[in-house]
Amino acid sequence: VDSLQHYLQRTYPFCYNNDFQYPHLGGEFLLQHAVGACREETDFMIYLLRTMGIPVASDRYIYSPDAFLGHSWSVFKDTTGSFIPTELLRTGVSREWNNRRRKGKVYREQTIPQKNSGSLFGSKLTDVTTDYYPTNQVVISSLQRKGKEKEGLVGVFSMNGWVPVGKYIWQNNRAVIENIEVGGLIYQPLRMNGNRWIPSGYPFLTDEEGRATSLIPDTIHTETVTLTRKHPLTQYWVDI
């Protein structure tokens, strides 16, 4: 896979373009018209690896507050049974792969519906967050249960509002999230109101140990500040 990727990086002039919304394109079309976004890159890599008999799939996150977009990439199964992520024109092949984007949750696309996918985005997406981050359990201690509510959603910040990326469930009157990216990422509990998502509690920040700190505003002791940037300049953008 590493040799194939290096060959493609030298000979396959893929033109990144996310201005258009394509259906899934065939391998022959992508070979002749090397254009599209990360999904088209991923599809082309999947076509190639499957012709070589290498087990391969597509992983994705729904939305990153760092990059302001969703993203997908290919993962192939190595001889140890582990799935190794790789991106066609961006990264090499490494078990220590890290594209440094905030992900929140990671999902794997399946070709057939899964009965117990555990995903709120449909039966063809399976939650594989633990392939990228250690298993954890985050408790939102400040969240108040509404009636007999069994579960709710958690989202991340976007310029157009909060975007759901996962869910929490109620266990012994505690709101619990299973397996999310922790450390420096702000999440927002959400519920549906009409046709839009609205906050159902205070946003919270997690530390590296998975402890959640709710960001509750102090309405008594106030300060006046000038806001010049709504979102921090992350290391991902600095490196670019």
Q: How would you name each of these model-derived features?
A:
Residues 144-161, 233-239:
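Short, ordered, surface-exposed loop/turn motifs in non-cytosolic proteins
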Residues 159-175:
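Short, acidic Ser/Thr/Gly-rich low-complexity loop/linker segments typical of extracellular
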Residues 1-2, 6-7, 18-28, 32-131:
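Hydrophobic/aromatic-rich core segments of domains that either
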Residues 173-196:
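Short Pro-Gly-centered beta-turn/loop motif in secreted/extracellular proteins
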Residues 136-145, 225-229:
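A short, amphipathic beta-strand motif
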Residues 192-221:
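Structured interaction patches on ligand/partner-binding surfaces of diverse proteins
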Residues 130-140, 233-239:
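Contiguous beta-strand segments within globular domains
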Residues 214-240:
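Compositionally biased low-complexity segments at domain edges in trafficked proteins
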